Amino acid sequence: MKYELTATEARVIGCLLEKQVTTPEQYPLSVNGVVTASNQKTNREPVMNLSEHEVQEQLDNLVKRHFLRTVSGFGNRVTKYEQRFCNSEFGNLKLSPAEVALIATLLLRGAQTPGELRSRASRMYEFSDMAEVESTLEQLAARDDGPYVVRLAREPGKRESRYMHLFCGEVDEPVSSDDAPQAASGDLHARVEALEGEVAELKQRLDSLLAHLGD
């Protein structure tokens, strides 16, 4: 697979995929917008503290690799960036809205269970049930031009296996365990994080609106 991203590149692309869907009025993003999204404390694992210089470096590299493109002119006072990672006019990687939501969430948070993914991706796509989440993951794992995700061995005490994207290379699978499954709070925790993410998005929109009114 030709997609081989660093952890920071994965974070930047994940942010652009997310914001393209959740805050289309603020998309494409400026460098400052990408910095804010990359260092966001909600729906990010791990939480990063990237500088503007570090983000600019990643953006320049991704533009050279044709994963992003710059947008300027037409009233834009600053250069902005939009993703060409998937679903671009001349790109080869085509993803459905459900697949975009899962890939973006995996790029932003790493390995997760289907239940966690359903909750955390809900702002980008509303899955009808767990079966739709699992079937979409299996499709991504079985694609002829992929695979793009892999199912990991179940961790001790967990009821669900986790899935991980393969855009940063192969994943070392943890040792499988036959321990009896225990009731886990992962899904509840994911739902709380999804709500926190919505609050953060609303705050960001409000700040943007207030800044616009102040101009």
Curated annotation (Swiss-Prot):
Database matches in SUPFAM superfamilies:
Winged helix' DNA-binding domain
Pfam families listed in its UniProt record = DUF480
Concerning InterPro entries, the annotation shows: DUF480, WH-like_DNA-bd_sf, WH_DNA-bd_sf
Where is the secretion signal located?
A: none
Instruction: Tell me which family the UniProt entry assigns to this protein.
Output: Belongs to the UPF0502 family.
The family database entries (HAMAP family) matched by this protein are listed as: UPF0502
Name by which UniProt lists this protein: UPF0502 protein CKO_01995
The protein's organism comes out as Citrobacter koseri (strain ATCC BAA-895 / CDC 4225-83 / SGSC4696)
